[in-house]
């Protein structure tokens, strides 16, 4: 089974790594939504021309073929989008920070428990930054 992804928010550059690494694992993605015009949007459209922008995020959330949502919206919006995605039956991988308040975290936990969906936070710096990976190789 191929895992199909949708994207909500491309406001932070981590979306490039999030999506490309998922594609390297065999996932597909052909739709994204972002609020307004993200600073990353021009480059995103160049790097991922097959991923088309939707004007309404419900097209992504209501698509039964989409299994998982990647979220790299502005930090204050990530929790609400993750909750909306889990309530729509999707698993979620959100850019860090996954939320910005303890109230948001409590709401995410409650939604995860109620829906049984996966909520995960992408953390890649220790695996991708050359200086860090080199330090690990030499035992630092």
What is the meaning of each model-derived region?
Residues 1-48:
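N-terminal Rossmann-like dinucleotide-binding module
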Residues 4, 28, 52-53, 59, ...:
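Conserved beta-strand segments of alpha/beta enzyme cores
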Residues 6-7, 92-95, 119-122:
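Short catalytic-loop micro-motif centered on adjacent basic/acidic residues
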Residues 18-20, 45, 81-84, 106, ...:
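Short amphipathic alpha-helical segments
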Residues 29, 66-69, 140:
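Local beta-strand N-terminus motif with an aromatic residue
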Residues 48-111:
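Beta-loop-alpha module in the N-terminal Rossmann-like domain of NAD(P)-dependent dehydrogenases
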Residues 99-140:
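A contiguous active-site-proximal alpha/beta segment in oxidoreductase catalytic domains
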């Amino acid at each position: 089974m191929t895992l199909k992804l949708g994207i909500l928010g491309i406001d932070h550059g981590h979306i490039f790594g999030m999506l490309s690494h998922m594609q390297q694992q065999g996932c597909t993605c052909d739709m994204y939504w972002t609020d307004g015009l993200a600073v990353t949007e021009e480059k995103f459209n160049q790097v991922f021309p097959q991923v088309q922008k939707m004007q309404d995020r419900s097209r992504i959330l209501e698509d039964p073929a989409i299994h998982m949502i990647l979220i790299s919206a502005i930090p204050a919006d990530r929790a609400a989008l993750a909750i909306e995605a889990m309530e729509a039956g999707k698993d979620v991988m959100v850019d860090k920070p996954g939320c910005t308040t303890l109230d948001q975290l409590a709401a995410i936990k409650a939604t995860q428990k109620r829906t049984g969906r996966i909520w995960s936070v992408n953390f890649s710096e220790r695996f991708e930054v050359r200086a860090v990976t080199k330090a690990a190789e030499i035992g630092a």
